């Protein structure tokens, strides 16, 4: 039986196909009629395990190959037929296959895999639609095997895929012909390219097959170095690659419709990450496909691991060119004018320089021998220190750096000793404001500290924005329902995602203002009314594309080298309402855009008389699609320095070009976040909620929630038209205290929770805080911390206090703004004077009882003041 299996394998290798079947199977080859097939040798599983057998079989095949190899022409689908027995035949007399080289059955114990070649430009006569199923019978039973044909870029993958294979990789180059492996045993038709013939352009980067194919930072830069744009063709390929990977969670993976729809979609996909792993197994022979998979994983799940970051170069960004933005020229102008704005950004750059200096010093300190460091501190040294000063051996020592008077007082009441030397290594607890003040390499296991390593993944603005996307894998949580979209503008893919999102929200804003009669034509410019109509219809087209299904979006991306909203379309959507001279002076542009509208919209829609009704239709569809629909009105975005706090460097914009001018030429990492344009207000003023959250363990994850909070209110009334007034948009006390007459109105800038609850009851006639807002804050706190569980370094005797900032919209939905490490504990107002004292004392109770007094074993019935346990991970 073993010899029979080997003979059938050798015959199949001579038959121009590379097929492996799982089990004793019969393959009907009739569905492979129009596929260009290139010969490749087959190694059976036995041959791959036995080198001697492999050599002998190679010698046998060498003598047979020249006589048995035949060419198959695929210029016409009529040239190929399927025999009754399932073999492959041709009507061309000069290229007829002999019966010996075309076996009708294949049997053996190996997995099914088929190679066929991508179609070139000249092969445009191929049949557009072919059967996507091949009959495979095993012991008389029928199985279905999927086949995908990558003939041209315009041949869309989902036409030949099963419902379970919704994401397919588009072919990148159509000028070259390559072979593709398709694993028909898989439900998602995994694809990888063969390394023969020699790869070119973006694909000319081979890897060592014996090494794990992990896309490290060094390899990433090597890949970028080898893929520099050398000609227009390669630039097009590179642009396609970037466009395909701009499938961010909100637009493609989780953005296929309402929450219920896409969560069901992910369930049907059997977890996309599993499919990514399946892709990787097939793709180990070629870096390009493996690069596809790694980028997909980065965008969907693990982008927050900073080793994956790809820093953007604005002067070479393709997406900037599509905007018509001359980066080099703008940067030069900004440098020339920097003297005028130098004072405004001096603090930002100084802070960045200090951070770099601190990081450098820390790295130099870490370079010391760890064993040598350990000799500086031990339990015996601490015991001798206590003995020399007359303290009892069981007395605890603490060091506190910062204004934490209430915490110090409570610990002293419990018999703790304060070590006044902040540089000393003798302590049982060290409470500091900055993590750098504690050297983790010098910590004994029993010493307690109030920071975890790598906490920037949770507390930095770019860190939390990226890590929150991990939630789709933990609990299928939709972050768009509680976190305004946020993008890291220093990262290539994030920046491109932001540009596309800005365009979509701009189109949505145009329709909203038109429906509300805020977008009207000047009576003196009635001749431009047709251009306004064009603008409204283009905005409808943009929203239509935004709500495409995942399959259709991938199809659009794979065949189109331009952004989803093209430069010409954006040139109209981005212009001021009454500035239609551009279209009047460029009738060809108007004509092309009119053709796009005719092609992408129904005739009834493109010729609609009532544009308001049409705009309302697309706005309703957008509302169903986007959980953040109500946040947008005038397309306002807020830009923040990623690593700074206390409102430093924050600006709001409603136009793209001023925003880009603001972030360019400054050595600061920026994030752009959607501005909440429908905030709930208190006496016409914006406000946010400061909530304390405490993590005492990461393994198992244990989270406490402080059972009260306080409200921070902006100094001036909310006015979305005045974006330069920080006192109307930022509620930070460090901002408000600089306002005129602050001392007279200081009590108006903060509110107790009890007063806020009563204020809401007067408006709504019922409680909205405890029944809705607080529950949502708890869920957001749990989910945000869970998203960083794999990124933050756990330590048994550490804890950390976080300050969460929330906002509430007019529908009483709660939104996360940011998370602060070492939140301010200053007595800035009467409200904070009372609550800070309570909060620090209760935190000291957690330290004293939970970590010291033998209550390390978790017990949710133990109370630590107002600290309430809301989450305990099950081991």
Curated annotation (Swiss-Prot):
Any GO CC annotation of this UniProt entry: microtubule cytoskeleton
Residues noted as binding ATP in the record, renumbered to the chain: 673-676, 686, 688
Compartment(s): Cell projection, Cilium; Cytoplasm, Cytoskeleton, Cilium axoneme
Pfam families: TTL
Entry keyword annotation includes Transmembrane helix: no
InterPro entries the record matches: TTL/TTLL_fam, TTLL_monoglycylase
Keywords for this protein: ATP-binding, Cell projection, Cilium, Cytoplasm, Cytoskeleton, Ligase, Nucleotide-binding
Purpose of the protein: Monoglycylase which modifies alpha- and beta-tubulin, generating side chains of glycine on the gamma-carboxyl groups of specific glutamate residues within the C-terminal tail of alpha- and beta-tubulin. Involved in the side-chain initiation step of the glycylation reaction by adding a single glycine chain to generate monoglycine side chains. Not involved in elongation step of the polyglycylation reaction.
Protein name per its UniProtKB record: Tubulin glycylase 3A
Protein's organism: Tetrahymena thermophila (strain SB210)
